[in-house]
């Protein structure tokens, strides 16, 4: 059995900064590419790779896009909760099929980019409850950092944030 610490980058600032803060403790970095991400997301991932000085492995769902996942699975976005079931098919399923099955006998620690706000702390608690078979690290929460703090660290690293933020979005999710 191997012990692995894995960071899943979302192409968002918070997930990158969380990984960056404990980069020397992380064995592998991953990004799951989705066709519907803004084209600038890949530039950001490459900039993150340069800052980390380590490769970021890129995985991709066979569905490719949100539309394909919706058509194949008949899922829709639930506006009230903000939950997009397509995320389950484009990210979670990829993680399970392309990573977790290969490492099912290993001790895995996942690094997450949730910040220190109460809402994000609640999300972290739900992750721990939903995935008890893994260990979890939340560097932004551990260091009391907010999303704004993460953006400030990114500026100090002289990395341009993903274009979706400059278009007024709070996160760098699908377009």
Language-model features: where?
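Nucleotide-activated chemistry modules centered on ATP-dependent adenylation/adenylyltransferase
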Residues: 1-175
């Amino acid at each position: 059995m191997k012990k692995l610490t894995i960071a899943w980058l979302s192409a968002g600032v918070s997930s990158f900064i969380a990984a960056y803060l404990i980069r020397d403790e992380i064995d592998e970095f991953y990004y799951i590419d989705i066709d519907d991400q803004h084209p600038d997301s890949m530039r950001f991932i490459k900039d993150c790779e340069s800052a980390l000085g380590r490769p970021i492995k890129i995985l991709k769902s066979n569905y490719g896009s949100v539309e394909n996942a919706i058509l194949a699975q008949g899922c829709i976005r639930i506006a009230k909760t903000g939950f997009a079931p397509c995320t389950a098919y484009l990210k979670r399923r990829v993680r399970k099929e392309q990573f977790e099955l290969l490492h099912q006998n290993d001790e895995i620690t996942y690094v997450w980019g949730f910040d220190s706000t109460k809402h994000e702390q609640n999300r972290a608690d739900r992750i721990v409850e939903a995935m008890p078979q893994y260990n979890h690290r939340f560097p932004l929460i551990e260091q009391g950092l907010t999303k704004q703090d993460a953006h400030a660290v990114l500026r100090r690293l002289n990395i341009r944030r993903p274009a979706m933020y400059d278009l007024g979005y709070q996160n760098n999710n699908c377009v």
